[in-house]
Amino acid sequence: MEIILVTLCLTTLLALLLLKSILKRTTTNNLNLPPSPWRLPVIGNLHQLSLNTHRSLRSLSLRYGPLMLLHFGRTPVLIVSSADVAHDILKTYDVICANRPKTKVIDKILRGGRDVAFAPYGEYWKQMKSICIQNLLSNKMVRSYKKIREDEIKLMIEKVENASSCSPPSPVNLSQLFMTLTNDIICRAALGRKYSSKEDGIDVENIVRAFSALVGEFPIGEYIPSLSWIDKIRGQDHKMEEVDKRFDEFLERVVKEHEDANKDTRSDLVDTLLTIQSDKSALKLIIWDMFLAGTATSLSFLEWAMTELMRNPKVMKKLQEEIRSSSRQGLFVTEKEAEKMDYLQAVIKEALRLRPPAPLMVPRVFSEDVTLKGYNIPAGTQVIINAWAIQRDTTTWGIDAEEFRPERHLDSILDFQGQDFKFIPFGSGKRICPGIGFTSALIGVTLANIVKRFNWRMDVEPQRVQHDLTEATGLVVFRKFPLIAIPSSA
């Protein structure tokens, strides 16, 4: 009897959910909505997403078009996969869709979006962004960190030299090396000193990776509250609590050190923020944004750029020939020298095109009803722009769009400042990544020096090369497996 009763209840519940879904679809049938794959009751199109969401969204867009409507649970989500549609959204409707959708991760770790990247569009966001740019990310401030960048790159080169001088040369974990480099530079620039797990007991590097992974996930409970128990079983809630705890402990320590320091020696971002921002919670979140802007994107680029160079030895050789002939033998390649190297700049652009650090731009949400390409888009619809798909679009980039070919940029004036919508590795519009200048200043000079001083080969068997290219899940996409390579002195 009990089994029959339970079965009857479940059947009734499913029938009601199905009826509700049908009624909702009937009301939206009066609107001219973008093409959409058939969705299941309750979960919508969530079952069609893979761990590498940018790849599954691109596959769907090839079938349903560059402007496609999906449903994550009951939440309508517009997927944009062409430069043409991205232009309309980021130019015509930039302000209307400048807000961010709220998520559990943002509410929990970022205190409802009190930072810059995820704050609601408005006066608070404008003020916080202005503070960050003026005190850390402006062109003037980025230039002032030149000595810090040079010091840390030279330390990195020393570590590689020690490995290459062994007989035989020792393998180098380039992923770890680049993480330490970018972390130490942003720590010195923004916080006044380095922080490391060895000396301070603070593993900033893994906090950055863990946070990026959390923000890039699509938890079931986010879109279907009644199924939030699944997230607990999968350990997502525990991971969020753990990241929040480690995140807050680190930032609390940073702020306290600066509060206790000699007030006459103020010189870094935290000191400046303490004088103008009384809200300690907001202050800590701004500091965290700088880590994401300055560390995660640079690390992702360097990992994938070196991966592609080692997979394409002809490109590596051509790049090394340019660098070695354009700078004095044995000496450090300066930032000015790197900026004038045409093929190096082409390699940077091609790596950003094929492997954008954030394949999916951070979601936005429409605050008003709009008409886009003849389709009705209701207010409340979320927008995800697939930069990864746009930058591999064969109609824009040619039939070799999947290939790593820097030569395509040599006769082009295309840049990555967000003005040309076929190439938006750092986003565009009002929400463009504020760390673009900081990252640009670091990646070129780092790549130039590590490629000039050493010859490189992957420490992996030929049959495992494809496995070695697996991507991690996250807002910023790193390699899933560390990039291990063997250096030899040039």
From Swiss-Prot:
Signal peptide (from-to): none
The EC code for this enzyme is 1.14.-.-
Q: How does it sit in the membrane?
A: Single-pass membrane protein
Kindly give the Gene3D superfamilies that the UniProt entry links to this protein: Cytochrome P450
Residues spanning the membrane: 3-23
- Supply the InterPro entries for this chain: Cyt_P450, Cyt_P450_CS, Cyt_P450_E_grp-I, Cyt_P450_sf
Gene Ontology cellular-component terms for this entry are:
membrane
Q: What class of enzyme is it?
A: oxidoreductase
Instruction: Cite the Pfam families for this sequence.
Output: p450 (PF00067)
Q: Any idea which GO molecular function terms this record carries?
A: heme binding; iron ion binding; monooxygenase activity; oxidoreductase activity, acting on paired donors, with incorporation or reduction of molecular oxygen
- Which parts of the sequence bind heme? C433
Q: Which cofactor is recorded for it?
A: heme
In terms of superkingdom, the source organism counts as: Eukaryota
Main location per UniProt? membrane
Q: Where in the cell is it found?
A: Membrane
Mind listing the UniProt keywords for this protein, alphabetically? Heme, Iron, Membrane, Metal-binding, Monooxygenase, Oxidoreductase, Transmembrane, Transmembrane helix
Member of which family? Belongs to the cytochrome P450 family.
- Report what the protein is called: Cytochrome P450 71A19
User: What lineage does UniProt assign to this protein's organism?
Assistant: Eukaryota, Viridiplantae, Streptophyta, Embryophyta, Tracheophyta
Query: What gene, per UniProt, encodes this protein?
Result: CYP71A19
